[in-house]
Design a protein with these regions (language model features):
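Glycine/small-residue-rich interface belts in oligomeric ring/scaffold proteins
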Residues: 3, 12, 17-65, 76
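Structured-RNA-binding interfaces characteristic of tRNA pseudouridine synthases
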Residues: 37, 48-185
């Protein structure tokens, strides 16, 4: 059994496909690309694969990770080509790496994620982008905490979101403000 980590991009209309559908999509892609993937045992065998921190619907990505186990493998280049040949526009495999037997799972390796956030077109602030960016940046650095109340089925919990933000910046791209966030996962 060989462990493989796959890095892929999700963009365009595929950003509207949910995690479970992406998982089924990759299961079909593995079969079509003739990847010799391992199956679980039991009455309902399924392909052994796990996604690291799957994104929500509507979010594009340049780096999502998927771990699989295979019985045998070809070269990384051949596997990437075989998978990409089966993919529709909007999903692209960018890396296919063999892992050591004692490698941690992709889920446990992801500690943070980088996000670029844009205003929806037509909803940009009326102020000059630089003035707006300076104001937001100043507000973020001066504020000691950002408290929210997280509600679960059984309780409510107050959380400080600022502790989860490792990096924050506001810049201008194509005349529009862009928020950059590196946040804990």
């Amino acid at each position: 059994m060989i462990k493989i980590r796959i890095k892929f991009r999700k963009y365009g209309v595929m950003r509207f496909i949910g995690h479970l559908d992406i998982m089924r999509y990759f299961q079909k892609a593995m079969r079509r690309a003739e990847i010799d993937i391992c199956y679980s045992e039991g009455f309902s065998p399924h392909q052994i694969m796990s996604f690291a921190a799957p994104l929500g619907v509507g979010i594009t990505s340049d780096g999502e990770y998927l771990d699989i186990e295979v019985n045998s493998t070809r070269s990384s280049e051949a596997s990437i080509k075989a998978l990409n040949d089966t993919m529709v526009e909007g999903v692209e495999v960018t890396e296919y790496v063999k892992l050591p037997d004692n490698a941690k799972t992709a889920m446990s390796m992801v500690a943070a994620a980088d996000y670029d956030l844009y205003f929806k077109e037509g909803y940009e602030p009326a102020a000059d982008v630089r003035t707006f960016a300076d104001g937001i940046r100043q507000y973020f650095t001066e504020k000691e905490e950002f408290l929210i109340t997280k509600q679960t089925k059984k309780s409510e919990k107050v959380m400080d979101l600022k502790q989860l933000v490792y990096a924050f910046d506001v810049s201008e791209r194509d005349g529009r403000p862009v928020f950059y966030l590196k946040v804990s996962t």
